[in-house]
Curated annotation (Swiss-Prot):
Key word Hydrolase present: yes
GO cellular component, one term: Golgi apparatus
Name of this protein: 2',3'-cyclic-nucleotide 3'-phosphodiesterase
Record's function text: Involved in the metabolism of ADP-ribose 1',2'-cyclic phosphate which is produced as a consequence of tRNA splicing.
Protein family according to the UniProt entry: Belongs to the 2H phosphoesterase superfamily. CPD1 family.
Name of the encoding gene: CPD1
Organism of origin: Phaeosphaeria nodorum (strain SN15 / ATCC MYA-4574 / FGSC 10173)
Location in or out of the cell: Golgi apparatus
InterPro entries given in the database record: Cyclic-nucl_3Pdiesterase (IPR012386), Cyclic_Pdiesterase (IPR009097)
Catalytic activity: a nucleoside 2',3'-cyclic phosphate + H2O = a nucleoside 2'-phosphate + H(+)
GO terms of molecular function: 2',3'-cyclic-nucleotide 3'-phosphodiesterase activity
Pfam families: CPDase (PF07823)
E.C. designation(s): 3.1.4.37
One Gene Ontology biological process: cyclic nucleotide metabolic process
SUPFAM superfamilies: LigT-like
Length: 193
C-alpha cells in the first residue's frame, strides 16, 4: 500500500483491544493466512511520507481535530470483497463523526487538499471497516462468513453495533507507514481523541 495511513484504534482501556487481536488470529488461522495486524479502522491512506517528516508526532498533533466531534465506530455486519485488504471485514456505519474525521484526514493526501475533494471522497468512496483477514484468495462465501460470525460471537464481539463490544467511541488515531511489508506495520505516532 503506497504511503502512510491513519488508523483509528479503540481507546486503550476498551475491552476490544484484547478481543479483536484474538479474532483476527483465529480468522487468519481458519483461512490459512500468515498475516497478522493491529485491529483498526482505516481513516485514510496514501499519505506521502514527506507530509509527516521529519516529526510524525508533531504532524499528527497539528491536525485540527475538533474535540466536540463525537467519533463513534459502530459495527454493522461481516462482509467480504475480492480485494486483498478487504478479504473479510466488519463493515462499520459511516457515522457523522467518522465521516468528518475522514474528510479532515483525507485533506492530507495529495490531490485532496480542498475540502470539496475530500468531502466527495468521504461520501462516495470511503468505506469504514475493520479488517479481520488479509489474504490472496477469492472472496469469502456465505458459509465462511457464517463460521466467522460464530467465532466473533464466541469472543463477545457484537457485529450489529450493540453493546460496548459492538464498536467504540473516541479512540486513538495512529500514523502507520503502510508502504512497508505488513509485518512491519507499526504506528510511528499516536494521538488520543
Amino acid at each position: 500500500m503506497p504511503g502512510s495511513s491513519l488508523w483509528l484504534l479503540p481507546p486503550k482501556s476498551h475491552r476490544l483491544n484484547s478481543i479483536l487481536p484474538t479474532l483476527i488470529d483465529q480468522t487468519s488461522s481458519h483461512f490459512g493466512s500468515a498475516h497478522r495486524f493491529l485491529p483498526h479502522v482505516t481513516i485514510t491512506s496514501e499519505i506521502s511520507p514527506s507530509t509527516h517528516s521529519p516529526n510524525p508526532q508533531a504532524w499528527l498533533d497539528s491536525l485540527e481535530i475538533s474535540s466536540g466531534d463525537k467519533i463513534e465506530v459502530m459495527f454493522e455486519k461481516l462482509a467480504s470483497e475480492d480485494v486483498f485488504f478487504r478479504k473479510l471485514y466488519i463493515k462499520c456505519h459511516k457515522t457523522e463523526g467518522l465521516k468528518k474525521l475522514a474528510v479532515l484526514c483525507r485533506r492530507e493526501v495529495e490531490g485532496f487538499g480542498e475540502e470539496r475533494e475530500a468531502a466527495k471522497w468521504a461520501t462516495e468512496s470511503y468505506n469504514p471497516h475493520l479488517s479481520l483477514l488479509y489474504h490472496d484468495c477469492p472472496s469469502i462465501d456465505a458459509s465462511g462468513l457464517a463460521e466467522i460470525e460464530k467465532l466473533a460471537q464466541s469472543t463477545g464481539v457484537n457485529l450489529n453495533g450493540q453493546s460496548d463490544l459492538g464498536g467504540w467511541s473516541g479512540g486513538r488515531l495512529v500514523l502507520v507507514p503502510t508502504d512497508k511489508s505488513i509485518d512491519q506495520w507499526s504506528p510511528i505516532a499516536e494521538r488520543e481523541l
